[in-house]
Curated annotation (Swiss-Prot):
Organism: Mus musculus (Mouse)
Main location: membrane
Gene designation per UniProt: Pllp
Full protein name: Plasmolipin
GO cellular component: apical plasma membrane; myelin sheath
Domain MARVEL: 32-166
Family, per entry: Belongs to the MAL family.
Function: Main component of the myelin sheath that plays an important role in myelin membrane biogenesis and myelination. Plays an essential function in apical endocytosis. Regulates epithelial development through the regulation of apical endocytosis. Part of the intracellular machinery that mediates basolateral-to-apical transport of ICAM-1, an essential adhesion receptor in epithelial cells, from the subapical compartment in hepatic epithelial cells.
Transmembrane segments: 36-56, 69-89, 100-120, 142-162
C-alpha cells in the first residue's frame, strides 16, 4: 500500500484579485444602447411589457388564446432582457466561441413567428371575450395593437441580424471592432 508523504507543498492565492479584475471589466457599453440593435431591443422590451401587462390585468386565464399570448410575451420579454444584458455589458465578446450573429438571427426570426401567432390569437379573441367598450375590451385591443408593434420590431431586428450574419456592408475586421452591432 502506498504511504502518504509527510510533507506536501501547497500554493495559495488570493481569489479577490481575479474576481475584482473581471467585475471591473463589466462596464456598460452606451454605444450599444445608441445602436440600431440596442434601440430595437429597448423598444421590444417596452412594448412587450405593455402587451403582457395589459393582458395580465384582465381575466386572461379563462381564455386559452390569452394564455398563449401571455406565454409568448413574457417568455420573449425575458429572453430579450438576457440578450440586452449580454450585449450591454459586452459579454458576447468574452463568449467568443458562440456565433452571436447566427444566435440573434435565429432568436429574432423565432420571436417574429411567435409574435405573429400571438398577435393573431390576441386580435381574434378580443371581440369574442369582452363587451365592446368595456375595460377588458380596451385593454385586449391595446394589447393586440402593441403585439403588432412588437412583432414588427422583432421582424426589423431579424432583418438587421440577417444582414449582420451575412456580413452586408462591412468586413470581418470592422464588424469585430464594432462589437457586432450596427
Amino acid at each position: 500500500m502506498a504511504e502518504f508523504p509527510s510533507k506536501v507543498s501547497t500554493r495559495t492565492s488570493s481569489p479577490a484579485q481575479g474576481v475584482g479584475a473581471s467585475v471591473s471589466a463589466l462596464r456598460p457599453d452606451l454605444g450599444f444602447v445608441r445602436s440600431a440593435l440596442g434601440v430595437l431591443a429597448l423598444l421590444q422590451l417596452a412594448l412587450g411589457l405593455l402587451v403582457w401587462a395589459l393582458i395580465a390585468d384582465t381575466p386572461y386565464h379563462l381564455y386559452p388564446a390569452y394564455g398563449w399570448v401571455m406565454f409568448v410575451a413574457v417568455f420573449l420579454w425575458l429572453v430579450t432582457i438576457v440578450f440586452f444584458i449580454i450585449y450591454l455589458f459586452q459579454l458576447h465578446m468574452k463568449l467568443y466561441m458562440v456565433p452571436w450573429p447566427l444566435v440573434l438571427l435565429i432568436f429574432f426570426v423565432a420571436a417574429t413567428v411567435l409574435y405573429i401567432t400571438a398577435f393573431i390569437a390576441c386580435a381574434a379573441a378580443v371581440d369574442l371575450t369582452s363587451l365592446r367598450g368595456s375595460r377588458p375590451y380596451n385593454q385586449r385591443s391595446a394589447a393586440s395593437f402593441f403585439a403588432c408593434l412588437v412583432m414588427i420590431a422583432y421582424g426589423v431586428s431579424a432583418f438587421f441580424s440577417f444582414q449582420a450574419w451575412r456580413g452586408v456592408g462591412s468586413n470581418a475586421a470592422t464588424s469585430q471592432m464594432a462589437g457586432g452591432y450596427s
